[in-house]
A protein has these predicted regions:
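Signal peptide processing junction and immediate N-terminal pro/mature segment
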Residues: 20-34
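Bacterial N-terminal signal peptides
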Residues: 10-24
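N-terminal secretory signal peptides that target proteins for export/translocation
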Residues: 1-8
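Cap/lid segment of the alpha/beta-hydrolase catalytic domain
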Residues: 122, 130-188
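Catalytic-loop region of hydrolases
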Residues: 30-124, 137, 148
Length: 188
């Protein structure tokens, strides 16, 4: 990945996906005013994200999540967030990868991400960092990374939230043998 691209690419990705979903922001605002009439529209806009094409980005999965409980965060020990089960509103989950490639060491690299777009979006965006050497994609909920925090996660407050793995998979430091992987992590 080019040195300057990652910090700008994730917000661009979120806005591009939002624009590609038939003006998610405008429709989300309308959905807040008339939730019963627009629930199907939000689900359709989510499904439409499968068709969005961006250079060097592979959309791997798009899923609509109905209102209800979300599983406990399996990465809470690494992120410091509460592992409590959450009651979330309807939202769209997009998983993908930015600039997939084979590294100098023959391993697969690329910045995997998860983006969650709430049906009732507040027009704000939160980038959720991974910490340490990354290597995993935490659920993009925007949980408060303080043990014992009772504050609601950003997604429950209407934020679009994205998380990513720092450009490599695994919690070890073997990726450090690949110079581009080191740079990707540094700029993530």
């Amino acid at each position: 990945m080019k040195l300057h691209r990652l910090p700008a690419l994730l917000p661009l990705l979120a806005s591009s996906l939002s624009a590609g979903s038939l003006l998610w922001a405008a429709n989300a605002q309308a959905a807040a005013a008339q939730p019963a009439d627009n629930a199907a529209d939000a689900q359709t806009r989510c499904s439409d994200l499968k068709e969005v094409e961006l250079p060097d980005v592979v959309i791997q999965r798009v899923k609509w999540v109905q209102r209800g409980g979300l599983a406990q965060d399996p990465n809470s020990a690494f992120t410091g967030a509460s592992g409590q089960t959450l009651q979330a509103e309807e939202h769209c989950v997009v998983r993908g990868e930015i600039e997939p490639r084979t590294g100098a060491d023959g391993r697969h690299y690329g910045t995997q991400f998860e983006l969650r777009l709430p049906a009732r979006w507040n027009h704000k965006f939160l980038f959720q960092g991974g910490g340490g050497t990354d290597g995993f994609v935490a659920d993009a909920l925007g949980r408060i990374p303080t043990r014992g925090s009772s504050a609601p996660p950003a997604l429950l407050r209407g934020y679009a939230v994205v998380s990513m793995d720092g450009g490599h998979q695994g919690r070890d430091t073997i990726f450090g043998k690949d110079q581009q992987a080191r740079l990707d992590l540094a700029y993530a």
